[in-house]
């Protein structure tokens, strides 16, 4: 029986060395194993949350790139509006020609606003301006991102026409709105970047803690296994000697 127990202990150390984990079953420490499994769940949660936040930054980068193109179009529209304001020199035909380019720019802005998307989700038409990202390991730990609305209606440019009464301030207001949206996107991106760093560091710290609780101390395990194997050998030899002595006593009796 003793020999069996020693052999079992030696086998357990061998399993620890082979697997790298000193927690082979609940018998090795039910409470500690429960803690380790719980922390592993948290580690996986923080890792996934970091990836979610990175996806969120991807969404914001796409939106910001689209706003950059819209800004260039608005700046050109402003140049044309200033040109069209020179009524002392320009004819109605000249202003109509300018309006033709303005209309092309407006159509380009509309196309960007209605077609910019990330994984099939529209980003600048106002339909998905408030999106939720799970940025923490647990329920309720998330962040909402807003990419704004860049449609002509939202920018106040739907009826902008330099052949009629118009105000250059209308384009300045649109530029200010786009600039505000881009500033918001930058702030949200920075927040997500901070979250990625926090999640990554927390995951690393928890991984170290779990490693200390779970990983086998190879040198100690080998030493203990050798001790148990030596005890097993000694016990075997003692049993063999006892059996030999018994046989000798029996021979003397008969």
Regions found by a protein language model. Give the residues of each.
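Amphipathic, heptad-repeat-like alpha-helical segments
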Residues: 2, 62-70, 91, 190-197, ...
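Type III/flagellar export substrates
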Residues: 164-233
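Alpha-helical coiled-coil/heptad-repeat oligomerization segments
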Residues: 34-37, 79-80, 175, 193, ...
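Proline-poor, low-complexity alpha-helical tail modules
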Residues: 1-21, 203-254
